[in-house]
């Protein structure tokens, strides 16, 4: 079955279709991970996107029940050079092709993914549509140029609060499109977690008596979530806070900094990040299309703690006055290296220190 990818600049790439027999539009991006395709297609941060894999053969080890980052995949399509229809792995339960058919997600194989990746790197992220061979190219191009993708966070955030009980510190986890890996890391440390929707107010969060607040990853432009920015303005300084990815960007906006769209984003499992305080470099998992503008941090109460070695963009922030820090990358990995996993320990240490300071103030009062 032939299928084509039509880009907003009029480029047409023809290959073999797999997965769901449906036409879908989305922002065409690329990821450089050699593995982790199951985590990628189930990562809510990819909501509304058509993901191109730069590694030439995808699907080798199939799909298993353990590696999902959300219950429902959020990608609008997959593009690969070659798909493996006969996976081999002791955990394999279903092939990637069959899984995408079940979930009605279209795929395209047999195209030059290097050519597509170079185009995205040269011209920036492009809107595209995976469609049948009888599609009207001119009409599709006109529709793509007029399309604006919004409300991604609303689509992937939980609709209702729910608990993930533990005996340790109570952490309110604000879900902007949370990867399950973040929740797993908190559960591993016996945190008493309450997951809440993206539009939960500061008053509602504080009513839960949290020891700490965690801001999850999520899709899209942080400026499309004004309610979260307002919530953070009211909550920063009252409770220890740790943000990841979109949570990092929202924290920056609430603190007076600015964000902007990257030309083609950071997506992959091997991005080097430097800790400016220690000089240490961590290899990190990343997935974002926006970043905090370095110059905008200067006149705020924030300090830059980490930078990307590939392009110098801001990868970490800390508040100068209050117990709050954030990172642009994914310390929970899933998939990817676990070099930055100790940030969860730093978060819990910050909570403990904040509690001790509060107890000392009460004793001295």
UniProtKB/Swiss-Prot annotation:
Q: In which pathway does it act?
A: Amino-acid biosynthesis; L-arginine biosynthesis; carbamoyl phosphate from bicarbonate: step 1/1; Pyrimidine metabolism; UMP biosynthesis via de novo pathway; (S)-dihydroorotate from bicarbonate: step 1/3
Q: Which UniProt keywords apply?
A: Amino-acid biosynthesis, Arginine biosynthesis, ATP-binding, Glutamine amidotransferase, Ligase, Nucleotide-binding, Pyrimidine biosynthesis
Task: Return the SMART domains for the record.
Answer: CPSase_sm_chain (SM01097)
**Gene Ontology BP terms:** 'de novo' pyrimidine nucleobase biosynthetic process; 'de novo' UMP biosynthetic process; glutamine metabolic process; L-arginine biosynthetic process
Q: Which Pfam family, any one of them, does this sequence belong to?
A: GATase
GO terms assigned for molecular function: ATP binding; carbamoyl-phosphate synthase (glutamine-hydrolyzing) activity; glutaminase activity
What's a GO cellular component annotated to this UniProt protein? carbamoyl-phosphate synthase complex
Q: Where does L-glutamine bind?
A: 45, 218, 220, 246, 249, 287, 289-290
The annotated active site, in chain numbering, is 245 (nucleophile), 330, 332
Q: Which domain of life is it from?
A: Bacteria
Extract the ranges annotated as region (CPSase). 1-166, 1-169
Q: What is its EC number?
A: 6.3.5.5
| Glutamine amidotransferase type-1 domain sequence ranges | 170-357
Top-rank EC class of the record's enzyme = ligase
Q: Which family does it belong to?
A: Belongs to the CarA family.
HAMAP family on file: CPSase_S_chain (MF_01209)
* Name of this protein: Carbamoyl phosphate synthase small chain
């Amino acid at each position: 079955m032939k299928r084509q990818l039509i880009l907003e600049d009029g480029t047409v790439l023809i290959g073999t279709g797999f997965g769901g027999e449906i036409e879908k539009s989305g922002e065409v991006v690329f990821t450089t991970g050699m593995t982790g395709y199951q985590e990628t297609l189930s990562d809510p941060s990819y909501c509304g996107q058509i993901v191109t894999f730069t590694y030439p053969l995808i699907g080798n080890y199939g799909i298993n029940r353990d590696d999902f980052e959300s219950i429902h995949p959020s990608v609008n399509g997959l593009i690969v050079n070659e798909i493996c229809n006969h996976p081999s792995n002791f955990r394999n339960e279903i092939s990637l092709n069959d899984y995408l058919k079940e979930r009605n997600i279209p795929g395209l194989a047999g195209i030059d993914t290097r050519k597509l990746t170079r185009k995205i790197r040269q011209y920036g992220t492009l809107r595209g549509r995976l469609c049948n061979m009888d599609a009207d190219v001119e009409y599709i191009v006109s529709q793509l140029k007029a399309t604006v993708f919004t409300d991604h966070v609303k689509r992937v955030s939980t609709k209702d609060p729910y608990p993930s009980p533990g005996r340790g510190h109570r952490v309110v986890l604000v879900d902007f499109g949370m990867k399950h890996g973040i929740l797993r890391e908190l559960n591993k440390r016996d945190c008493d977690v309450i997951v809440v929707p993206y539009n939960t107010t500061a008053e509602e969060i504080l009513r839960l008596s949290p020891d700490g607040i965690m801001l999850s990853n999520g899709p899209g432009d942080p400026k499309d979530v004004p309610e979260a920015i307002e919530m953070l303005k009211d909550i920063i300084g009252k409770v220890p806070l740790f943000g990841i990815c979109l949570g990092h960007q929202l924290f920056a906006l609430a603190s007076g900094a600015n964000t902007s769209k990257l030309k083609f984003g950071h997506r992959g499992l091997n991005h080097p990040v430097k800790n400016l305080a220690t000089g240490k470099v961590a290899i990190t998992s990343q997935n974002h299309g926006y970043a905090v503008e370095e110059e905008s941090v200067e006149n705020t109460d924030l300090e830059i703690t980490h930078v990307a070695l590939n392009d110098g963009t801001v990868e970490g922030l800390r508040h100068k006055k209050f117990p709050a820090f954030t990172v642009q990358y994914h310390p929970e990995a899933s998939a990817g290296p676990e070099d930055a996993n100790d940030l969860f320990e730093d978060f819990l240490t910050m909570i403990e220190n904040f509690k001790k300071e509060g107890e000392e103030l009460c004793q001295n009062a």
